[in-house]
Amino acid sequence: MMKSFGSIRSIFMHADGVDWMLMALGLIGAVGDGFITPIIFFICSKLLNNVGGSSFDDETFMQTVAKNAVALVYVACASWVICFIEGYCWTRTGERQAAKMREKYLKAVLRQDVGYFDLHVTSTSDVITSVSSDSLVIQDFLSEKLPNFLMNTSAFVASYIVGFLLLWRLTIVGFPFIILLLIPGLMYGRALIRISMKIREEYNEAGSIAEQVISSVRTVYAFGSEKKMIEKFSTALQGSVKLGLRQGLAKGIAIGSNGITYAIWGFLTWYGSRMVMNHGSKGGTVSSVIVCVTFGGTSLGQSLSNLKYFSEAFVVGERIMKVINRVPGIDSDNLEGQILEKTRGEVEFNHVKFTYPSRPETPIFDDLCLRVPSGKTVALVGGSGSGKSTVISLLQRFYDPIAGEILIDGLPINKLQVKWLRSQMGLVSQEPVLFATSIKENILFGKEDASMDEVVEAAKASNAHSFISQFPNSYQTQVGERGVQLSGGQKQRIAIARAIIKSPIILLLDEATSALDSESERVVQEALDNASIGRTTIVIAHRLSTIRNADVICVVHNGRIIETGSHEELLEKLDGQYTSLVRLQQVDNKESDHISVEEGQASSLSKDLKYSPKEFIHSTSSNIVRDFPNLSPKDGKSLVPSFKRLMSMNRPEWKHALYGCLGAALFGAVQPIYSYSSGSMVSVYFLASHDQIKEKTRIYVLLFVGLALFTFLSNISQHYGFAYMGEYLTKRIRERMLGKILTFEVNWFDKDENSSGAICSRLAKDANMVRSLVGDRMSLLVQTISAVSITCAIGLVISWRFSIVMMSVQPVIVVCFYTQRVLLKSMSRNAIKGQDESSKLAAEAVSNIRTITAFSSQERIINLLKMVQEGPRKDSARQSWLAGIMLGTSQSLITCVSALNFWYGGKLIADGKMMSKEFLEIFLIFASTGRVIAEAGTMTKDLVKGSDAVASVFAVLDRNTTIEPENPDGYVPKKVKGQISFSNVDFAYPTRPDVIIFQNFSIDIEDGKSTAIVGPSGSGKSTIISLIERFYDPLKGIVKIDGRDIRSCHLRSLRQHIALVSQEPTLFAGTIRENIMYGGASNKIDESEIIEAAKAANAHDFITSLSNGYDTCCGDRGVQLSGGQKQRIAIARAVLKNPSVLLLDEATSALDSQSESVVQDALERLMVGRTSVVIAHRLSTIQKCDTIAVLENGAVVECGNHSSLLAKGPKGAYFSLVSLQRTLF
């Protein structure tokens, strides 16, 4: 009981006084709404008795009919007020409470310590789910599910109250049948939910394969793995097809079982006849009570079906309340603790022991002692996992040590106020975290109340002002999600500006330049050196050249400091750990003794090398860009989708389609036949002869029982048949779409609308929508056409006058039902848009929680959330009024139409133009058919979506790629030597046509030799590899392999002779063996070949040391393996391919020194006897290449081997690059 109370409290914990008032009024409205329909039944019993039993010549007949019809109008007016209150109050309070929940929840999440996120590996996705879908669950529960539950429950109670008031005996007899009405829905509802969850799980596996393939499309193309991936995808889809068929069968049984309602109606009809004959009950009263009993049972069933939403809301509410009430061990909101008036910045670690909360069995520090003097720079170096970055995390109190203490100016940091402590530090990380806002706003994350002058000064100090000023919008330039609109060096300089605007006493630099090229590194390093002046600075770096000027260098190994001293002091220890690390990174040139370029000279040479796309564009683009529109064909929108063409894709399933259509048509006929029979049965109660009543009742009872059985069988046929159609169509569409997508040129994937997430969403949603269109919607359409046709035919035959009037008011009925079922639900689009923006913000904040925590920017994020929600909040207030008006109007109009029908029907009877039996038959037929048409009307929205989905599917299937991988006329090379040449090539990326990469570019690469490409970022190094792989075609000029234009070759055959190893190795979810096998041409590869490839890649030893060896799962994108391990598996994959041409794109740049040494050794073995194109920032990795080409502004400015290029001296471009990276001895 207590837990239940706690769960209820968790849902309403965000309500304030206004919300409680709204909910109280909403409760009155929902209960009143539930009472309306039974009250209408009560009035209708009087009308039926008037119509069925009075003397129609009596003058009082029309007066009585008119009086009861007016009573219905009064009820209609009351229902408008009641339904308006219900619709407005619940919609309004739902939005208000959900908005407050999102704000409190995100605030609570951002308050948590970093260790919380380490222990909850899914915390980011959990937060996104809670801010988006969980808040929608609460909002939907309060706005729709709870009022529906209250309304249906009160309708159940009111129905039985009216039943007891009218005819208590019949009501008591009907009461036990409620159980029979509930069983089918409850039993099969659960089964359908279980199957739906399994289908989602099954498709998630296939969706995961598709996502990996599309996000790694360059790797898939490079290794020719398209067919393998499509086969894997197809196999994964088969499971969801089988479950889909089970779902169709279960749905048919579930809906078919509802036919028991007709059998219950038959029994109550029989018992009602006994009441008429033996107790003198009136026919109208009996009929109304039967309707009340069945309506009450149905209402209870609908009410109980809403209980699952209660449990769902309780779970969500408990989960959110748990986070909101959690007080973290390191609480940034806790304002207790000391604040020092003046801080020197002296840092000391005394005998610190530490393990990460997520890995308590792995000690990081056992007895760490470290002292950082005030105003000095201390560098921490060592291998991966030695604990360098942990020092920074502990100093910022992301975690607390298990033992020992950390002091600042002699005071333990756990005695200091957390927020103040972090304000004294500025952090710059390896991967700079920027938020999707302007440059100015990103810098202000460091200091919220900073003036524009302070922002500019910080930018100048970080060497960022000059490039920011070149942007058209200057400091208002939007950086994009995660700063994608900026280069690595630009992002890093903005991150430095953010760190120094707060004037920190302590500066923390964690691998701040490791991911940058030499030129960007020089500029950023200069900014860091400036920022460090006068500050206590702790530096972590892999590139030892960046920390050689540190006051103290500490070598960290296995969580302890094993060496301390300056650069020169540590180098004196010939066998020292620092010396060995330096040797690994040493640029081996015999002339190093003679390289003594003055710092200023090296700097000026570097500036000469600086690539300025802006200046280059103005001078070169005029003759190229004007031709661009014709060179990048736009995807034309598909023609109006052809339903016939869609059906042709379903041709193999035509037999099942026939069964489905037949079942739908037969079930469509059930409702009008049932309504007609019910109307006829009411008139039977008014017969004078008891024998006639008995005889006719027996016939109708048997008819109702027959309809129950007929409903069961026709639904099974309908739903299984259409499920079979839909499932196989979905599978076929997904296979064809993925197959077609994997023929598209890489440029297609570069567009924002074709990201891996967007494509996978289309594969999932578009195919599902088409299945829904062909399966569910088509069956409903056939069913509706059948019902409407039979209804109109029966009505016109019986009484054309009354039928025409009933037909004329049907649109009103349909619109009212449609409003209740569709429009009210679709009004939340703006709210959902607001949720999307909230989710985006939450995802960005939580995935960058360390940056948020380091800069104490929680309040800033909450303010951004309020801004994001402001628009949807205002829209919601208007929508609440609209919801109330629409709900009230639709309910009252339905009642008014009933009043009109009764009045007009009574008039026709009084005038002798229609019999009472005919009136009852037509009235009930059209009343029920209005609901059927409205039900079909709810699919109009789905038809539009389905039409869009069909267009989307055919847009993919009909699109012609600009780079055909399976050109039947293409030359198929049997053997490739590997001689490569670029002749007068012009190129710009299609997504950035105004940025010219190459103009008149030429280079020759000898076969069997290794050629290195070096140069600053943006000079076009990686573009060379993309053009060789023919990911793109040049705008002008020719790329040749072995003297043949690669555009004339069969592309997939050509790629079989080329292997690519990238900076970030792409592994797929699967075993190590499967990942290596992607390098093979077929699926049948000997184990010995796999092992030989692994040995050649220096991977065999570490693979065999794993518990499952080659059967070890790599995890999604290889997350279970380290960077060096992943890279060696990628090399083994390339070895297995036995390529003639090897392309190495920054293959070791992201590795630490030890991993780099092992991987570099494997690469050098692989390069022997092959044409190799090597791109590298670290020049130590390419000094042994036969040829080194230096690129600048999209042109080769120098070419030769390592020694010959160095011989050119300080004026040489290569010499300048080496100077930037040299380590002095």
From Swiss-Prot:
Q: Which residues are glycosylated?
A: N530, N754, N960, N1000, N1201
May I have one GO cellular component term? membrane
Note one Pfam family from the annotation: ABC_tran
Extract one GO molecular function annotation from the record: ABC-type transporter activity
Residues covered by the ABC transmembrane type-1 domain: 23-312, 657-945
Q: What keywords is this UniProt entry annotated with?
A: ATP-binding, Glycoprotein, Membrane, Nucleotide-binding, Repeat, Transmembrane, Transmembrane helix, Transport
Q: Gene3D superfamilies, per this entry?
A: ABC transporter type 1, transmembrane domain (1.20.1560.10), P-loop containing nucleotide triphosphate hydrolases (3.40.50.300)
Q: Is the keyword Transmembrane helix in the record?
A: yes
Tell me the membrane topology, using the record's own terms.
Multi-pass membrane protein
Residue stretches making up the ABC transporter domain? 347-583, 980-1218
Source superkingdom: Eukaryota
Residues that coordinate or bind ATP 1: G382, G383, S384, G385, S386, G387, K388, S389
Write the protein's name: ABC transporter B family member 18
- Its gene? ABCB18
